[in-house]
């Protein structure tokens, strides 16, 4: 598989719901369509919240690693 080219990394370690998703929303606004935001989190709620956010906001969750903490999510900005 090709390596995912990350545009920006967002560290939300230590933050709890709803802060991680709020920060993702804030940071992704400043990215261009097609850019990738790597989100690093340790809040178990992000395993549900990040995929839901992507679907609702029409972004693409390219990959997630949620077997071990820290969790990692690669979010590609949509339109």
UniProtKB/Swiss-Prot annotation:
Predominant subcellular localization, coarse grouping: cytoplasm
UniProt KW Iron keyword: no
Molecular function in Gene Ontology: sulfur carrier activity
InterPro entries the UniProt entry points to: Sulphur_carrier_TusA, TusA-like, TusA-like_sf
Protein localization: Cytoplasm
Record GO biological process: tRNA wobble position uridine thiolation
Pfam families: TusA
Active site: 17 (cysteine persulfide intermediate)
Any one Gene Ontology cellular component term annotated for this protein: cytoplasm
Keyword annotations from UniProtKB, A to Z: Cytoplasm
Domain of life assignment: Bacteria
Family stated for the protein in its record: Belongs to the sulfur carrier protein TusA family.
Matching HAMAP family: Thiourid_synth_A
NCBIfam families per record: PRK00299.1
Function description: Sulfur carrier protein which probably makes part of a sulfur-relay system.
Protein name: Sulfur carrier protein TusA
Lineage: Bacteria, Pseudomonadati, Pseudomonadota, Gammaproteobacteria, Pasteurellales
Gene transcribed to yield this protein: tusA
């Amino acid at each position: 598989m090709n390596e995912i080219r990350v545009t920006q990394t967002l560290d939300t370690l230590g933050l709890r719901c709803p802060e991680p998703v709020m920060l993702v929303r804030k940071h992704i606004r400043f990215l261009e369509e097609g850019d990738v935001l790597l989100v690093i989190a340790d809040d178990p709620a992000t395993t549900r919240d990040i995929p839901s956010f992507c679907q609702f906001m029409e972004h693409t969750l390219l990959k997630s690693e949620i077997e071990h903490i820290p969790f990692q999510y690669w979010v590609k900005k949509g339109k």
